Amino acid sequence: MPRIENEPKLDFKDVLLRPKRSTLKSRADVELDREYVFRNSKATYTGVPVVASNMDTVGTFEMAAALNNHKIFTTIHKHYSVDEWKAFAASASPDTFNNLAISSGISDNDWTKLNTVITELPQLKYICLDVANGYSESFVEFIRRVREAYPKHTIMAGNVVTGEMVEELILSGADIVKVGIGPGSVCTTRKKAGVGYPQLSAVLECADAAHGLNGHVMSDGGCSNPGDVAKAFGAGADFVMIGGLFAGHDQSGGDLIEHNGKKFKLFYGMSSDTAMKKHHGSVAEYRASEGKTVTIPYRGDVNGTVQDILGGIRSACTYTGAKHLKELAKRATFIRVTQQTNDMYVPFEVPTVPAPSK
């Protein structure tokens, strides 16, 4: 019988972080590096736990090389060929593989390709198993299969939005569970399927479930600005995956388009018409597109955006009195709000000029 849960679920836009007394004198005093030991692989991670999404307009080899300079992670999209992987490995800095994951679906072809790439590139340490609906039994079985084949690799898996499924994926072999259904800027699942979960509440609940098993969670989607990234960490996310904020740069995928003397880059969801026609030839007759395609202003080199995101996180830590990023979730108190910002002069803002690549 249908039922309604009456407890309100919250998104990033519904809250702000309350400022608290702080002993920090400067944002420069904040330490963003985290160190994790993963439950199943037993491997140790050290870095800044911001992650570029495994979309083909974001998770590129070029993005991985650029973000590695900041100790930021990249999940490489799954549509690179084995030969492209080998060419990248031949030219990449060895330490890039400390901040990089190979992504895979769960089909037989995906399994074959995953095995081939890992055989050719033994330096790979991370595997990202990515499906839109992480609640299927076939997905759980695939995680078990990968864990059995690669016991020392760290496995990211998702997406789900509820605690009981987080526990299921961790107990099946996942080290990091990706949390988020429908919050992304170019995702339309909530409109097409009517399914989803507000991202802040999803992260709060899933982090609680994962941490009880010594597992980890990655908030995936819904961050439209650096403040949202800080809120995700404050809600208990161990990693925060970003798509749209990393799109539109020199290192991003997507076609560069000129219109009326201005430059734009194409950005689209991986379940959009654009993505399915590009990678599969058409949209299967039994399904609907659950993503959209947009043109976003060209942003130049990604390093400027990285500085903006990390600066925002440092500022949030300073306001809440968290000297280390790991303290932010302990220091965070969220207040519900009816309005976040004063948008009086938004139509008159001077646009940022993209910084050229070096």
Curated annotation (Swiss-Prot):
Transmembrane segments: none annotated. K(+) binds at G182, G184, C187, R190. It catalyses: IMP + NH4(+) + NADP(+) = GMP + NADPH + 2 H(+). GO terms for cellular component: GMP reductase complex. The keyword Metal-binding applies. It holds the Pfam family IMPDH. The active site is at C187, T189. InterPro entries: Aldolase_TIM, GMP_reductase, GMPR, IMP_DH/GMP_Rdtase_CS, IMP_DH_GMPRt. Keywords: Metal-binding, NADP, Oxidoreductase, Potassium, Purine metabolism. One of its GO terms (molecular function) is metal ion binding. GO terms for biological process: purine nucleobase metabolic process; purine nucleotide metabolic process. GMP binds at D220, G221, G222, G243, G244, G269, M270, S271, R287, A288, S289, E290, G291. The keyword Oxidoreductase applies. It is an enzyme of class 1 (oxidoreductase). It comes from the Eukaryota. NADP(+) binds at residues 26-27, 78, 130-132, 181-182, 270, 286-287, 315-318. Its EC number is 1.7.1.7. Belongs to the IMPDH/GMPR family. GuaC type 1 subfamily. Homotetramer. Catalyzes the irreversible NADPH-dependent deamination of GMP to IMP. It functions in the conversion of nucleobase, nucleoside and nucleotide derivatives of G to A nucleotides, and in maintaining the intracellular balance of A and G nucleotides. This is GMP reductase. The gene is gmpr-1.
